[in-house]
Amino acid sequence: MLNVAVLVSGGGTNLQALLDSEARGENPNGKITLVVASKPGVYALERAAKAGVEGVVVRRKDYATSEAFDAALLETLKSHNIDLVVLAGFLSVLGPSVIEAYPRRILNVHPALIPSFCGPGMYGLRPHQAALARGCKVTGATVHFVNEAVSYTHLRAHETTL
């Protein structure tokens, strides 16, 4: 069974969907064993606690450099024997050391159908608002493997909604 860490920055609605799916037995090959928040006090940590999952905070601003932040994050993941990382509304960009430590084992959940409505500022409800403002008839979400290029060449799934 894979030990899964979910990285979050806010309310944790994607985290809750993953926890609910796990509770229904839909993920027999993995278990969420750690939630890492980018700041204290986010509701996602409360969701983790309610589900009996350990929650920790690793804040970028607590480290002098991005490399130091990445080292702290990597140490947190390794010390919890994490096999798979899911970015579920995590608003920090991971550095090369983290990505290299988890090749094709970091998944990002993006709230739009990539390549539309992605890039700076496109997180949370913003991609959906942009899609509505543009008059899109179909919207949805994308799950993709994270790579150093911040590209979307390794898409795992598109899920559309009307």
Positions of the model-derived regions?
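Short, surface-exposed acidic-centric catalytic microdomains
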Residues: 30, 34-59, 63-67
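Short, glycine-/small-residue-rich phosphate/pyrophosphate-handling segment
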Residues: 119-152
